[in-house]
Swiss-Prot record:
Family as reported in the entry's similarity comment: Belongs to the endoribonuclease YbeY family.
Stated role: Single strand-specific metallo-endoribonuclease involved in late-stage 70S ribosome quality control and in maturation of the 3' terminus of the 16S rRNA.
Entry keyword annotation includes Protein biosynthesis: no
Encoding gene (name): ybeY
Cofactor binding remark: Binds 1 zinc ion.
Localisation: Cytoplasm
Main EC class the enzyme belongs to: hydrolase
Superkingdom to which the source organism belongs: Bacteria
Protein name per the record: Endoribonuclease YbeY
SUPFAM superfamilies linked to this entry: Metalloproteases ('zincins'), catalytic domain
Keywords: Cytoplasm, Endonuclease, Hydrolase, Metal-binding, Nuclease, Ribosome biogenesis, rRNA processing, Zinc
Length: 161
C-alpha cells in the first residue's frame, strides 16, 4: 500500500476452482478500485475489509433468488455493509465464474479483462456506489472506466464491433 491509499483486508473463497483468478490478481484489482474510489471522493472511507467468493452456477442462482428475487445466476452480487465510525468499509462480493466466462465469450472480451471489470464493479458496490438512478449509474460507470483505463483495459460499456 502506498502512502495515502486506503488499506485493504481481502479474503477470497473458492467454491469453484478458477485458476485464472488467483488471490493476488483479485487483490490487485480491488486495490485499483479502492484507489480510484478514494480519488473520486464520493464515499468517505480509509480502508476496506472485503470477502470475494467465486461460485458456480447453482450457488450463484440460489443467492440471486434469495437476495434479489431473481431466479438466475448473475455475474456479480455484492453485499454492502457500510462504513464504520473508524472509516472501514465492509462488503461481500460473489462472482459467478460460469456466468463471467459466458459473458466474456459472448461480448468477445478476454476472461481476465471481464473479470477485472466485474471485480472493480463489485468493490465499488461494496463501498456504496450504485447504478439504480441514471446519475449514479453515469458516475459509477465513468469511475469504472477510469480505473480500467489505468490498467490498460478498454471501456467495457462500449459496444464491440
Amino acid at each position: 500500500m502506498k502512502a495515502g491509499e486506503p488499506g485493504l483486508a481481502l479474503a477470497v473463497q473458492y467454491a469453484v476452482a478458477e485458476p485464472r483468478l488467483p488471490r493476488w490478481r483479485l487483490r490487485r484489482w480491488a486495490g485499483y478500485a479502492l484507489a480510484g474510489a478514494a480519488a473520486d471522493g464520493l464515499i468517505d472511507f480509509q480502508a476496506a475489509e472485503l470477502n470475494v467468493r467465486l461460485v458456480g452456477q447453482a450457488e450463484g442462482r440460489r443467492l440471486n433468488a434469495d437476495f434479489r428475487g431473481r431466479d438466475y445466476a448473475t455475474n456479480v452480487l455484492t453485499f454492502e455493509y457500510g462504513v464504520d465510525p473508524l472509516g472501514t468499509a465492509r462488503g461481500d462480493i460473489v462472482i459467478c465464474a460460469p456466468v463471467l466466462a459466458r459473458e466474456a465469450r459472448e461480448q468477445k472480451k478476454s476472461f481476465v479483462d471481464h473479470a477485472t471489470h466485474l471485480t472493480i464493479h463489485g468493490v465499488l458496490h461494496a463501498l456504496g456506489y450504485d447504478h439504480i438512478k441514471v446519475r449514479e449509474a453515469k458516475r459509477m460507470e465513468a469511475l469504472e472506466t477510469r480505473i480500467l483505463a489505468r490498467m490498460g483495459i478498454a471501456d467495457p460499456y462500449l459496444l464491440a464491433d
